Amino acid sequence: MAKEKFERTKPHVNVGTIGHVDHGKTTLTAAITTVLTKKFGGEAKAYDQIDAAPEEKARGITINTAHVEYETANRHYAHVDCPGHADYVKNMITGAAQMDGAILVCSAADGPMPQTREHILLARQVGVPYIIVFLNKCDMVDDAELLELVEMEVRELLSKYDFPGDDTPIVKGSAKLALEGDTGELGEVAIMNLADALDTYIPTPERAVDGAFLMPVEDVFSISGRGTVVTGRVERGIVKVGEEIEIVGIKPTVKTTCTGVEMFRKLLDQGQAGDNVGILLRGTKREDVERGQVLAKPGSITPHTHFTAEVYVLSKDEGGRHTPFFNNYRPQFYFRTTDVTGSIELPKDKEMVMPGDNVSITVKLIAPIAMEEGLRFAIREGGRTVGAGVVAKIIE
């Protein structure tokens, strides 16, 4: 059977299920594919197909993740589901599966549990912009007041972590009933309500090409008679010949002009997100630009040294450290294309961090890096990765 061509007729959105163990994330994932396939076509996935999530590697870290896709009336969704709590932590911190929105699954029978809280906190730290709640197992709760209480608890928890708890859509249902083909309010109807909430509450994400121009510097060459060429892959936006751009990071920010764009030895009038290009810079010396800097639209990104981050520390089995680290630990932080040394300050209540832990830290780098919240990095010691992290808040 020939592979079907991917029809990009509908806007594409990335989502995922989060929540406490055994609250029904995987059952819900199976139910969504089953119900939406009946209505909009596609391929249904059974529970055990999703549960047997294959291993992947992201930044050298092994993560089990299941990927499914489904359609609604006006969108195409890619959806990730992880079997274990540790997989969620790694997935969200490494950005292996960037989410435009998350579906928080919470059992109406149990209410919010420790991982419910932890996943909401992680979503906040790593910059998941929207959360929709699916209150699962509602068929097991006869008391309407109890349901109301659980809903209130979930809303309060969301508000506590700076999500708009009062305005968050909460869909009540039973993933199990929906999966079994029950057409009632808690069954297939609830799944359609959830699909509707996804379509209306999560805005269509900005495409990479529509963002402000940014290109990490990978290499710098000097071409006699023409000037300095910087190569790299455009991360977002478009750069046109003749436009002003800034060189940001490591050293003080300088402005220059793009006088040429080439790809595969051909001259172009612009380079855009996804392109591997060489950019010719006017009046810039070879020694003015180095790996680790970025070329960017003027004013769109600034250099920083001091920030808070959420990090995952690799376990010994993953090739990480064998021993814990303590306050003022000084590893290298690998941002985009280069390492910068920095020191780590642990939270007051944390004396040390063990391999396999995730923790919120404060970092001070010895040189500034073009940075924004949500930027991913690796933590390295002498070239080997010992952790992964994401910038949560910029301090200065």
Swiss-Prot record:
Alphabetical keyword list: Cytoplasm, Elongation factor, GTP-binding, Hydrolase, Magnesium, Metal-binding, Nucleotide-binding, Protein biosynthesis
G3 as annotated region, ranges: 81-84
Tagged with keyword Protein biosynthesis: yes
Sites where the protein binds Mg(2+): 26
Stored Gene3D superfamilies: P-loop containing nucleotide triphosphate hydrolases, Translation factors
Catalytic activity, reaction form: GTP + H2O = GDP + phosphate + H(+)
Enzyme class label: hydrolase
Superkingdom of origin: Bacteria
Region annotation (G5) ranges: 174-176
Domain tr-type G: 10-206
One GO MF term: translation elongation factor activity
Location of region: G4: 136-139
Protein's name in the database: Elongation factor Tu
Organism, scientific name: Burkholderia vietnamiensis (strain G4 / LMG 22486) (Burkholderia cepacia (strain R1808))
Encoding gene (name): tuf1
